[in-house]
Curated annotation (Swiss-Prot):
The gene is atpI. The keyword Transmembrane helix applies. The keyword Transmembrane helix applies. One of its GO terms (cellular component) is plasma membrane. The lineage of its organism: Bacteria, Bacillati, Actinomycetota, Actinomycetes, Kitasatosporales. It is found in: Cell membrane. The chain crosses the membrane at residues 12-32, 37-57, 70-90, 95-115. A possible function for this protein is to guide the assembly of the membrane sector of the ATPase enzyme complex. It is a multi-pass membrane protein. One of its GO terms (biological process) is proton transmembrane transport. This is ATP synthase protein I. Belongs to the bacterial AtpI family. Keywords: Cell membrane, CF(0), Hydrogen ion transport, Ion transport, Membrane, Transmembrane, Transmembrane helix, Transport.
Length: 144
C-alpha cells in the first residue's frame, strides 16, 4: 500500500479501535463478561470489514478507476451480506451478549466512517497526475 493509503487506514483504524475499547468497557459494566466479549467481537468484525473494504477500494481506484463507484456499491453489498452470514451463524449463541454486540458494531462502524471521512478530507490527494519531470528523448531514427 502506498504511504497515503496507510495513513488513511491508520487515521480510521485507531479511533475505531479506541471506540471499540470504550464499548468493551461499557458493555462489561452493563452486561458483564459476555457483554465485553460481544463488544470485542463486534469491534474486530467491524474493523476487519471496513479495513478490507478500504484496501479493495484503494486498489480499485488505482488500477481500474472507471469501476470505482460500481466497486464501492458491490463492496457495500458484500459487507452487508457477510454480516448477515455472520449473524445467521451466531443467531442463538450464548458466547456473547447480542445486544452489546449490535450496539458496539454500530458505534465502531460509525466511528470508522467518521474518522475515514476526516482522513480523506485532510489528505492531499492529486486529482490529476503530474507530468514526469524528466523529458523523454525524441526518437530521431527510422522506425521500422
Amino acid at each position: 500500500m502506498p504511504s497515503n493509503d496507510v495513513r488513511i487506514l491508520l487515521q480510521a483504524a485507531v479511533p475505531a479501535a479506541a471506540v471499540g475499547a470504550v464499548a468493551a468497557v461499557v458493555s462489561a459494566v452493563v452486561a458483564g463478561g459476555k457483554g465485553a466479549v460481544g463488544a470485542v467481537v463486534a469491534t474486530v468484525l467491524a474493523m476487519l470489514f471496513m479495513g478490507i473494504g478500504l484496501y479493495v477500494l484503494q486498489r480499485t481506484a488505482k488500477s481500474l478507476p472507471h469501476l470505482f463507484q460500481a466497486m464501492g456499491l458491490m463492496l457495500y453489498a458484500a459487507q452487508i451480506l457477510l454480516l448477515f452470514v455472520f449473524l445467521a451463524a451466531f443467531k442463538n449463541t450464548t458466547l456473547f451478549n447480542p445486544r452489546s454486540f449490535a450496539v458496539s458494531l454500530l458505534v465502531v462502524t460509525l466511528a470508522w466512517i467518521a474518522a475515514q471521512t476526516r482522513a480523506h478530507m485532510k489528505a492531499k490527494v492529486l486529482y490529476v497526475e503530474p507530468e514526469p519531470t524528466g523529458e523523454k528523448p525524441e526518437k530521431t531514427g527510422h522506425s521500422s
